[in-house]
């Protein structure tokens, strides 16, 4: 008995009304929630990345680049001062 897994064919799924009723709501809501996540700045807070205006400070105008992997913690402390 080869070839049949008793699953619905993909063409049946994407041509059904039920599929489009569900996905016409979920797909746009994913885009809207992603846009809100980024535009409100929550993405910066969640992932801990600096905001565009926080890369350079008045005291430090060089690029905050970690160059020594064995003294990385010291370099991080220096950049966060």
UniProtKB/Swiss-Prot annotation:
The record's annotation in Pfam families points to: Cytochrom_B559, Cytochrom_B559a
Which amino acid positions bind heme, per UniProt? Answer: 23
Q: What cofactor is needed?
A: heme b
Entries under InterPro entries matching the protein: PSII_cyt_b559_asu (IPR006217), PSII_cyt_b559_asu_sf (IPR037025), PSII_cyt_b559_CS (IPR006216), PSII_cyt_b559_N (IPR013081), PSII_cytb559_asu_lum (IPR013082)
Key words of the record: Chloroplast, Electron transport, Heme, Iron, Membrane, Metal-binding, Photosynthesis, Photosystem II, Plastid, Thylakoid, Transmembrane, Transmembrane helix, Transport
Q: Which SUPFAM superfamilies match?
A: Cytochrome b559 subunits
The terms describing its cellular component in GO are:
chloroplast thylakoid membrane; photosystem II reaction center
**Residues making up the signal peptide according to the UniProt record:** none
Task: Provide the GO MF annotations for this entry.
Answer: electron transfer activity; heme binding; iron ion binding
- What does the subunit section of this Swiss-Prot or TrEMBL entry state? Heterodimer of an alpha subunit and a beta subunit. PSII is composed of 1 copy each of membrane proteins PsbA, PsbB, PsbC, PsbD, PsbE, PsbF, PsbH, PsbI, PsbJ, PsbK, PsbL, PsbM, PsbT, PsbX, PsbY, PsbZ, Psb30/Ycf12, at least 3 peripheral proteins of the oxygen-evolving complex and a large number of cofactors. It forms dimeric complexes.
Q: Which PANTHER family match?
A: CYTOCHROME B559 SUBUNIT BETA-RELATED
Question: Which family does the entry's similarity section mention?
Answer: Belongs to the PsbE/PsbF family.
Entry protein name: Cytochrome b559 subunit alpha
Q: Which species is this UniProt entry from?
A: Mesostigma viride
User: Which gene is the coding source of this polypeptide chain?
Assistant: psbE
